Amino acid sequence: MKAVIQRVKEAKVSVEGRVVGEIGQGVLVLLGVEIGDACPQADWMAEKIVNLRIFADSEGKMNLALPEVKGEMLAVSQFTLAGNCSKGRRPSFDTAAAPEEANRLYSYFMGQVWERGVPVQSGIFQADMEVSLVNDGPVTFILETPPKR
């Protein structure tokens, strides 16, 4: 499982011109599910992102996590994170999970974030989406779950 996390002042996702998810301060998470990912990977990713100390404290130091700043999450599924561009000019998506499994784990991931006390908004799985955001920093991180055992 891979994620791109961007600290945002606000973000929204639209489908066919209609806003389907919108947040204020928090993180935009682009989430890619790969073959072999399961609930333990989603648990790890939810725990890591919710508790990642990427928000400034009173001294301007990155020292606060989402719950401490009452931040929100906008989660957007993005199978292209599983893309491999190492050969040729066309990306290969051989490592991307099947859509049914990816959707199940995407939904499970969001549930785990909710259980940890962070409000979550989302895009629509497999929809053609437009994502708008105001980066805060910018602060961007790429996370990948530890190797599967």
Swiss-Prot record:
GO terms for molecular function: D-tyrosyl-tRNA(Tyr) deacylase activity; Gly-tRNA(Ala) deacylase activity; Ser(Gly)-tRNA(Ala) hydrolase activity; tRNA binding. It comes from the Bacteria. It is found in: Cytoplasm. GO terms for biological process: D-amino acid catabolic process. Disulfide bonds: none annotated. Its EC number is 3.1.1.96. GO terms for cellular component: cytoplasm. A Gly-cisPro motif from one monomer fits into the active site of the other monomer to allow specific chiral rejection of L-amino acids. Homodimer. Belongs to the DTD family. An aminoacyl-tRNA editing enzyme that deacylates mischarged D-aminoacyl-tRNAs. Also deacylates mischarged glycyl-tRNA(Ala), protecting cells against glycine mischarging by AlaRS. Acts via tRNA-based rather than protein-based catalysis; rejects L-amino acids rather than detecting D-amino acids in the active site. By recycling D-aminoacyl-tRNA to D-amino acids and free tRNA molecules, this enzyme counteracts the toxicity associated with the formation of D-aminoacyl-tRNA entities in vivo and helps enforce protein L-homochirality. This is D-aminoacyl-tRNA deacylase. The gene is dtd.
